[in-house]
């Protein structure tokens, strides 16, 4: 595989520690390219890339791009970043992350999973399935897949499984042979501006599927179903609906596992089990059953693959137990994800749930405040902390205080505001033996779980 014919390329990633950027960087490193990058902080991800031969520097500086051939950025990188400014001055090509991902995908049959929620889990399941089936895929995922030990995998096979990011429209760079859409909810409206523009973006993504490919669409979701009259590519649907081409029935949630019967139209494919928490994961697994069946993977192989899936970090990850308290961490940061994860915690444990939630981005808090206000009903106790800005400037009215007031106004009886540095100590005062503590959010809330465990063990 060669992306550059003239000479080995030196590829530089601005913000290489991001989960989406690092996966592409790792694949390129494994292909033998000279990869460098910068990030504001050191992390497990940057240390891993350095161990693979990447040149990773802390902080952003113009001299980091002096000897590179191409600069890769994500939508989180500002145009006044010193490395971007210097690359522009030197006329070094600057390309978005999705364009580099698309270049890798052009050499493979792409399996691209998109959707407002569930895409990391579904992408991980799909990559695990193809690996289990002996197809040795390349994969780039938005989370660390436990069976791979990474968020990226370089395979020798013909398939590449990727998580398609709709947040900035960059998934429209991706050329999918198989495109999956799990759901479409109002999200990332700072980029899309309107829900109709977001819907049109997903439609354009689906219609990029070539004549020999297939779109796999969740008919249970009304916005996804509304696309069907306008879809020009060949497609099949999946869901619990009796109109679905691939249907799940007899869904059973039992502890840390979900089981369901799968049908292709009226033909039974058998009963499947996946060790994931929450009823919603039946549909994520069903999407993978549909992928496998459309690719000709035998149902027995799919059944074995789903049963052996080891999960994804920060997707209902049990961080530990101390003092009779179990601490679980999850990336959920959209109201629909919050609801599903809290319900999953209740179904899995049947115990009191204490939720530590960190809102992510001012724009999301502002745009989805009414939805957030009713998302925490399955939390017995809610400790709400400061908004994680993710590079955004504050917005008047988009505050944790406003969110707490909205949640209380909708009837929640136990909501407290706690500054992030005090969160673990506040949780320590509220928990009791038998509780489930769920840390929720896409920011640094993930560190609160280990902090609490340390206090409980002291």
Curated annotation (Swiss-Prot):
Gene Ontology annotations for the cellular component aspect, listed alphabetically: cytoplasm
Subcellular location: Cytoplasm
Major localization listed first in the record, in broad terms: cytoplasm
Pathway(s) served: Cell wall biogenesis; peptidoglycan biosynthesis
Reactions it catalyzes: UDP-N-acetyl-alpha-D-muramate + L-alanine + ATP = UDP-N-acetyl-alpha-D-muramoyl-L-alanine + ADP + phosphate + H(+)
GO biological process, one term: cell wall organization
Alphabetical list of Gene3D superfamilies matching this protein: Mur ligase, C-terminal domain (3.90.190.20), Mur-like, catalytic domain (3.40.1190.10), NAD(P)-binding Rossmann-like Domain (3.40.50.720)
Aminoacyl-tRNA synthetase among keywords: no
Entries under SUPFAM superfamilies matching the protein: MurCD N-terminal domain, MurD-like peptide ligases, catalytic domain, MurD-like peptide ligases, peptide-binding domain
Keywords associated with the record: ATP-binding, Cell cycle, Cell division, Cell shape, Cell wall biogenesis/degradation, Cytoplasm, Ligase, Nucleotide-binding, Peptidoglycan synthesis
TM regions (residue ranges): none
This enzyme's EC code(s): 6.3.2.8
Key word ATP-binding present: yes
Any one GO MF annotation of this record: ATP binding
Record-linked InterPro entries: Mur-like_cat_sf, Mur_ligase_C, Mur_ligase_C_dom_sf, Mur_ligase_cen, Mur_ligase_N, MurCDEF_pg_biosynth, UDP-N-AcMur_Ala_ligase_MurC
Residues the entry annotates as binding ATP: 115-121
Family stated for the protein in its record: Belongs to the MurCDEF family.
Function description: Cell wall formation.
Record's protein name: UDP-N-acetylmuramate--L-alanine ligase
Protein source organism: Anaeromyxobacter sp. (strain Fw109-5)
Taxonomic path: Bacteria, Pseudomonadati, Myxococcota, Myxococcia, Myxococcales
């Amino acid at each position: 595989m060669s992306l550059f014919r003239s000479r080995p390329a030196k590829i530089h990633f601005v913000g290489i520690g991001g989960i989406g950027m690092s996966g592409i960087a790792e694949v390129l490193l494994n292909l033998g390219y000279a990869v460098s990058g910068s990030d504001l902080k050191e992390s497990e991800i940057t240390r891993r890339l350095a161990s693979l031969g990447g040149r990773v520097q802390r902080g952003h500086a113009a001299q980091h791009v002096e000897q590179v051939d191409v600069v890769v950025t994500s939508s989180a990188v500002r145009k006044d970043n010193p490395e971007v400014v210097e690359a522009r001055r030197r006329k070094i090509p600057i390309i978005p992350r999705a364009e580099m991902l698309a270049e890798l995908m052009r050499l493979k049959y792409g399996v691209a999973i998109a959707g407002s929620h569930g895409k990391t889990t579904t992408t991980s399941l799909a990559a695990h399935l193809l690996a289990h089936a002996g197809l040795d895929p390349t994969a780039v995922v938005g989370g660390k897949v436990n069976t791979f030990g990474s968020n990226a995998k370089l395979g020798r096979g013909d398939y590449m499984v990727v998580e398609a990011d709709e947040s900035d429209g960059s998934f429209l760079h991706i050329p999918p042979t198989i495109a999956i859409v799990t759901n479409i909810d109002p999200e990332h409206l700072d980029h899309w501006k309107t829900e109709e523009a977001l819907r049109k973006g997903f439609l354009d993504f689906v219609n990029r599927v070539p004549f020999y490919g297939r779109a796999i669409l969740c008919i249970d979701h009304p916005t996804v179903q509304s696309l069907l009259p306008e879809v020009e590519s060949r497609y099949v649907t999946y869901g619990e609906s009796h109109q679905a081409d691939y249907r799940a029935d007899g869904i059973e949630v039992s502890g840390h596992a979900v089981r369901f019967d799968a049908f292709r139209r009226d033909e039974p494919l058998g009963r499947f089990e996946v060790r994931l928490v929450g009823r919603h994961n039946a549909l994520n697994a069903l999407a993978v059953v549909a992928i496998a069946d459309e690719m000709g993977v035998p149902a027995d192989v799919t059944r074995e693959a789903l049963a052996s899936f080891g999960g994804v970090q920060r997707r209902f990850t049990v961080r530990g137990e101390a003092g009779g308290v179990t601490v679980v961490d999850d990336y959920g940061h959209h109201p629909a994800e919050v609801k599903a994860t809290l319900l999953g915690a209740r179904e899995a444990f049947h115990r009191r749930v204490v939720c530590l939630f960190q809102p992510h981005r001012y724009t999301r808090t502002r745009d989805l405040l009414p939805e957030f206000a009713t998302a925490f009903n399955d939390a017995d106790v809610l400790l709400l902390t400061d908004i994680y800005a993710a590079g955004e400037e504050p917005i008047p009215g988009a505050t944790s205080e406003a969110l707490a007031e909205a949640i209380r106004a909708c009837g929640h009886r136990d909501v407290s505001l706690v500054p992030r540095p005090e969160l673990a100590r506040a949780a320590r005062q509220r928990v009791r033996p038998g509780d489930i503590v769920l840390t929720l959010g896409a920011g640094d809330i993930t560190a609160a779980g280990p902090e609490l465990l340390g206090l409980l063990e002291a």
